[in-house]
Amino acid sequence: MEGKNLTSISECFLLGFSEQLEEQKPLFGSFLFMYLVTVAGNLLIILVIITDTQLHTPMYFFLANLSLADACFVSTTVPKMLANIQIQSQAISYSGCLLQLYFFMLFVMLEAFLLAVMAYDCYVAICHPLHYILIMSPGLCIFLVSASWIMNALHSLLHTLLMNSLSFCANHEIPHFFCDINPLLSLSCTDPFTNELVIFITGGLTGLICVLCLIISYTNVFSTILKIPSAQGKRKAFSTCSSHLSVVSLFFGTSFCVDFSSPSTHSAQKDTVASVMYTVVTPMLNPFIYSLRNQEIKSSLRKLIWVRKIHSP
């Protein structure tokens, strides 16, 4: 079968959750609701952190960046899916597909890095509270966040350029609701060995760094918490990181099942469902997890609402 270079093909087709467009119509309302809740919730977290000077700390600086990443992450995939359902089309241009792939990989890895950075912040807060301000200086916080953005932008660009170098067969149907890397590789007519090798090396390395940071940080955190004599002290210390731990478990538990398995063993339906969990559900739940379990966020939300009530006509 003769392959065509990616740049010579005008479009491909996102099959979504079903090849029949009529079967996807009931999903429109659900995904629109989840998208609006996700964007509104994460932007509200950012607004609260910016407006309340008491939240101008390293922990909330990282949380604001995580909320920004979540809002951008869900905006990379869901709007195109909603537009396709609304206009009864499955088409996406190849340039649009590559652009979606770039931003998807950027924000999914950025979220992983930010969660690892927040785990380190939690470790310093619990294990070295007296030196917290000295260690988590503004310069270090800005460096960690900036490095996460820059490294993942370059990492995503590498994968996008490698994808652009492949040739594709006559079948341009992607069994997914967005342009993910593994479904695209499965359509290639040329040997994607280089792409898969880069995925294995860079994905494995970055994943290992993030996971090791999480494991080492939380091992020390739990060890320190267990040494606290009072039950109240243990609860207070654990509450500092419980929200973050919940988000970490949900995000990594679903994303690892999809991104670090061989393309030959992938089930399109299972991948699609799992991808919904970490591309839509997790970004939607993050603001609720952090706001419901965090007294400072709840207090700032109440103050923000109260101030707006006072100034409203």
Swiss-Prot record:
The chain crosses the membrane at residues 26-49, 58-79, 101-120, 141-158, 197-219, 237-259, 273-292. It is a multi-pass membrane protein. Keywords: Cell membrane, Disulfide bond, G-protein coupled receptor, Glycoprotein, Membrane, Olfaction, Receptor, Sensory transduction, Transducer, Transmembrane, Transmembrane helix. It comes from the Eukaryota. InterPro entries: GPCR_Rhodpsn (IPR000276), GPCR_Rhodpsn_7TM (IPR017452), Olfact_rcpt (IPR000725). Belongs to the G-protein coupled receptor 1 family. This is Olfactory receptor 1G1. It comes from Homo sapiens. The lineage of its organism: Eukaryota, Metazoa, Chordata, Craniata, Vertebrata. The gene is OR1G1.
